[in-house]
Amino acid sequence: MLIFPLINDTSRKIIHIDMDAFFASVEERDNPKLKGHPVIIGSDPRLTGGRGVVSTCNYEARKFGVHSAMSSKEAYERCPQGIFISGNYEKYQAVGLQIREIFKRYTDLIEPMSIDEAYLDVTENKLGIKSAVKIAKLIQHDIWNELQLTASAGVSYNKFLAKIASDYEKPHGLTVILPEEAEVSLAPMDIAKFHGVGKKSVEKLHEMGVYTGADLLKIPEMTLIDKFGRFGFDLYRKARGISNSPVKSNRIRKSIGKERTYAKLLYSEEDIKKELTLLAQKVENSLTKHDKKGRTIVLKIRYADFSTLTKRKSLNLATQDKEQIERTAHEIYDSLEEQPRGIRLLGLTVTGFE
């Protein structure tokens, strides 16, 4: 019987920094008249015939149930008084680089997860500060003092717990999870909020009666491995606050994509192209967040019989522009010689990053 050894390195000092409602906060900073009003970064559905997707929104808008990846139309229905801003992604990228420079004052072991989120390993840092909490506070102070923006921070001995900690108290919060607090902190948490546990895994866990960290803690290691393979061992460790993944300063992302499965099959060209437009917007949002441009657009289609078709097209210049991605996706779809049949999944991916 295969049992992986449990090795828990609690000697590291990891900080997870997550900017608070980043795009919206930059807009509020640059236009103080927006403060106190619900701000939604996304196309105004009144100007686009209801099309568009929310990139992010401030905390005022979130009180109305608005959130990222929601259609702009639904966001308007929930919050008609919301102020829609299409967004200035070049400005956000420039501010993101300023934040990165602040991180570099303390350590070079930085793993950016997106334009507004990163892990920092400060076990050995440039200033010789022993307290990771002190460094997190200094970073928050620097970001506010120099950029007038707030960030939430999580501090722990691994990335998994630091990420969870940064979500505890927002905005401008700082939460620490110590080794002896890990299991207690995770026990009441919804399993869907465990970083790295996807939707399908959550569904399988629910089938097993697992809804919280405490539930997961009760499941034997071999049961999880039998159900999930090696990922089952990862789940077993996560429930115990164990994760030894290093902070990778040279982490390279090769592609960014979004896909959607439809409960009701798509048949009409109008519906299919409408969905491709929504996917293109989501891909643009993700590309912007990760500061990436790519030269190849990949369209993925899964039909009713579960057969899958993938086709790509290369561009002369790298892009992160929604209009270019949408146009190329439509061109790829138009070039297909498939007989009309129901579509259960559509996916759009951009790769070939520069």
Curated annotation (Swiss-Prot):
Pfam families: IMS, IMS_C. Its cofactor is Mg(2+). The active site is at residue 117. Poorly processive, error-prone DNA polymerase involved in untargeted mutagenesis. Copies undamaged DNA at stalled replication forks, which arise in vivo from mismatched or misaligned primer ends. These misaligned primers can be extended by PolIV. Exhibits no 3'-5' exonuclease (proofreading) activity. May be involved in translesional synthesis, in conjunction with the beta clamp from PolIII. This is DNA polymerase IV. One of its GO terms (cellular component) is cytosol. The keyword DNA damage applies. Monomer. It comes from Streptococcus sanguinis (strain SK36).
